Amino acid sequence: MADYKNLAKSEIDTFLRNNQHGILAMAGDKPYALPMGYMYKRKAILLGLATAGSMVTTGRKMNYLQESKQVCFTICQPRWYGETLKNPCTTLIIEGSLEEVKNRSYYGIKKIPQTIQLKLYKIIVAKKGARKCNRKPCELLTVKK
């Protein structure tokens, strides 16, 4: 039996709905990755990026997005999730580009005050792969005596 199983589309959809955090990676002169929350609405992965103002100053992520909208977004549910090792390790890796969302109401998202400088983006998926480990419990983490 293979160590990993590729997820079906319905499993990917469930995985995206049941998680809230991922790592957004960008590449400019130096690779850059940042952990962040996301929303999954209407089959779209939505990311809010602070642009300036009271939350942050314009930083590296916005500079990278000016150079290239190409990103990689990784969502991982580690085996050690909760109090046991019983859950299979599951990973989803998405490659694509970011597109600014102009119509927040389409996704059921309220307008935010102008004082909060936050842009909403969705990932335009070019490629994705998702799999989970078949090992139960994980032999990689279990020490045999």
Language model features: what each stretch is:
Residues 1-18:
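N-terminal leader/targeting segments and the immediate start of mature chains
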Residues 2-6, 78, 82-145:
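Charged, gly/pro-rich active-site loop segments
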Residues 12, 57-61, 105:
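Amphipathic alpha-helical interface surfaces
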Residues 14-28, 70-75:
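A short, Trp-centered hydrophobic/proline-enriched beta-strand micro-motif
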Residues 20, 34, 43-45, 67-71, ...:
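A generic structural signal for short beta-strands and their flanking turns/coil linkers
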Residues 39-81:
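A short mixed-secondary-structure module that forms the rim of ligand-binding clefts
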